[in-house]
């Protein structure tokens, strides 16, 4: 079953599609700014999802139990970095492991200069990442921002970084190179 949420909808409410195990695809319009807690929790049949750049917050465990997720599609890395993820299971990357930007699989993530902070849980579980480059414009990395990125081997940090929160790179078991400027 696939669902297209109509244009004009601004919020996907708490538990809106909770435990809809037969749900395989969801189209979310650009009008949506928030996804409520547990909104897609238990949707084990969901295989991919596109999160529009209009989304600014995703509630607690919104994607918990979405074990069939393979791919997450976005169009703006800067907007993704700014989403407020309430917990680790608010990000669909926890299960999907693969992030696509404008259709292309992201393995070497280059954060754009327009970004000043990377939010907590932003890339949690994105095992498809192998390298991350953080520009001078970024001053803070949120808690667990890159936790569980098991494929990540190198991180290059910019000069502007003043704060790296708890667990930012926790469980990045493949990480071998971290470049920090003087």
List each model region and its residues.
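Structural signature of tandem-repeat unit edges
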Residues: 1-11, 21-34, 44-57, 66-83, ...
């Amino acid at each position: 079953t696939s669902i297209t949420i109509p244009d004009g909808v601004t919020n996907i409410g708490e538990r809106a599609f909770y435990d809809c195990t037969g749900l395989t695809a969801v189209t979310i319009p650009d009008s949506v700014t928030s996804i409520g807690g547990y909104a897609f929790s238990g949707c084990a049949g969901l295989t991919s999802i596109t999160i529009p750049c209009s989304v600014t917050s995703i509630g607690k465990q919104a994607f918990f139990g979405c074990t069939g997720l393979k791919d997450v599609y976005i169009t703006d890395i800067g907007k993704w970095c700014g989403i407020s993820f309430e917990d680790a299971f608010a990000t669909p990357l926890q299960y999907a492991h693969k992030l696509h930007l404008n259709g292309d699989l992201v393995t070497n993530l280059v954060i754009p200069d327009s970004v000043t902070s990377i939010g907590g849980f932003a890339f949690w579980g994105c095992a498809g990442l192998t390298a991350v480059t953080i520009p001078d414009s970024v001053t803070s990395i949120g808690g667990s921002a890159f936790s569980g990125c098991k494929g990540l081997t190198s991180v290059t940090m910019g000069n502007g970084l003043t704060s790296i929160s708890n667990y930012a790179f926790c469980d990045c078991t493949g990480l071998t190179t971290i470049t920090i400027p003087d």
